[in-house]
């Protein structure tokens, strides 16, 4: 049961003809008239009035909840907008991240290319048939540079 229905039931249950039966009504008004038809007519008039009041209250309750829902929706939308990023800001941030990643990737790619060239040069020195005693100092220098590089990391 929703809030609207709960409020409607609460108000409807508070109406006079809901609270007292015809018998109780008759007992309360017997001192004013003993004509049961007159009492029945009065009670029916009260029931008709309660039905009109119920109908009017139902319309007012519906309108109240429509207005309340509308206000809450506007409030939630404004709160959401105040705490969210615009699509443009998000796209700009993603482009900046992309640029940073591209720069870092280029640095890594350049380092890999440099090391690949050094290894290719080393391989050529080792496989060279002319690599004799005069190539050994160059090889030792390259090996020492790799040892230094490994010790730094």
From Swiss-Prot:
One record GO biological process: chromosome segregation
Where it sits in the cell: the answer is: Nucleus; Chromosome, Centromere, Kinetochore
Q: Which GO terms describe its cellular component?
A: kinetochore; Mis6-Sim4 complex; nucleus
Q: Tell me which InterPro entries the record gives.
A: Nkp2/Cnl2
Coiled coil residues, start to end: 86-128
Superkingdom of this protein's organism: Eukaryota
Q: Does the keyword Metal-binding apply?
A: no
Matching entries from Pfam families are given as: Cnl2_NKP2
Q: Which UniProt keywords apply?
A: Cell cycle, Cell division, Centromere, Chromosome, Coiled coil, Kinetochore, Meiosis, Mitosis, Nucleus
- Keyword Methyltransferase in the entry? The reply is no
Q: Which family does it belong to?
A: Belongs to the NKP2 family.
Question: What the protein does?
Answer: Component of the kinetochore, a multiprotein complex that assembles on centromeric DNA and attaches chromosomes to spindle microtubules, mediating chromosome segregation and sister chromatid segregation during meiosis and mitosis. Component of the inner kinetochore constitutive centromere-associated network (CCAN), which serves as a structural platform for outer kinetochore assembly.
An additional note in the Swiss-Prot or TrEMBL entry is: Present with 1630 molecules/cell in log phase SD medium.
Complex and partners: Component of the inner kinetochore constitutive centromere-associated network (CCAN) (also known as central kinetochore CTF19 complex in yeast), which is composed of at least AME1, CHL4, CNN1, CTF3, CTF19, IML3, MCM16, MCM21, MCM22, MHF1, MHF2, MIF2, NKP1, NKP2, OKP1 and WIP1. NKP1 interacts directly with OKP1 and AME1.
From the Swiss-Prot or TrEMBL record, give the protein name.
Inner kinetochore subunit NKP2
Source organism per entry reads Saccharomyces cerevisiae (strain ATCC 204508 / S288c) (Baker's yeast)
